[in-house]
Design a protein with these regions (language model features):
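Membrane-interface helix-boundary signature
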Residues: 3-7, 11, 35, 39-42, ...
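Alpha-helical membrane-associated segments of multi-pass integral membrane proteins
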Residues: 4-11, 95-129
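Hydrophobic alpha-helical transmembrane segments of polytopic
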Residues: 7-14, 42-49, 73-80, 111
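Hydrophobic transmembrane helix segments
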Residues: 13-54
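Aromatic-anchored segments of alpha-helical transmembrane domains
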Residues: 14-24, 79-90
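Interfacial non-cytosolic loop connecting adjacent transmembrane helices
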Residues: 28-44, 85-110
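Alpha-helical transmembrane segments in multipass membrane proteins, preferentially the mid-helix core
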Residues: 50-63, 118-125
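Loop-to-transmembrane helix junctions at the membrane interface
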Residues: 56-83
Length: 133
């Protein structure tokens, strides 16, 4: 019964970290982000959290009891995390986060509120077999 708890904690951390990084990109720009904040060491933490969130999220799927839009958001969040893993693991393997420059700055303007909303949504997911938490 731990997979839903682990998913909830790691997914919230992933989305809050994504929110913080994208907001930082908006405020200081991609050049300073890569030079001062978003290093391969940060990517190690980010990639590990994503891997744990993806594994525990897929393991929790059969116990998901949330319905309607929240169920759709669960799928969206889980697929987003899962598909993002190769990008972030690659940064660790090649020891570079310079790929950030590939994305236009407005991308972060979209990602920032989306990641904050996803972090909140993850806290609302409910799973069979857990208490009223």
């Amino acid at each position: 019964m731990r997979a839903p708890f682990i998913y909830r904690v790691t997914a919230v951390c992933v989305f809050l970290m994504g929110f913080a990084l994208h907001l930082t990109n908006v405020v200081i720009g991609p050049d300073r982000l890569v030079a001062k904040v978003f290093s391969p060491r940060v990517e190690i933490v980010f990639a590990v959290m994503m891997i744990v969130a993806a594994i525990s999220g897929w393991m929790s799927l059969k116990r998901l009891s949330s319905r309607g839009l929240l169920r759709v958001v669960y799928w969206f969040a889980l697929i987003l995390i899962t598909l993002s893993i190769p990008i972030h693991v690659r940064s660790v393997v090649i020891w570079s986060t310079a790929w950030v420059h590939v994305f236009p700055k407005y991308y972060s303007h979209v990602e920032t509120p989306m990641f904050l909303a996803l972090a909140y949504a993850v806290t609302r997911f409910r799973f069979r077999g857990e208490g009223s938490t």
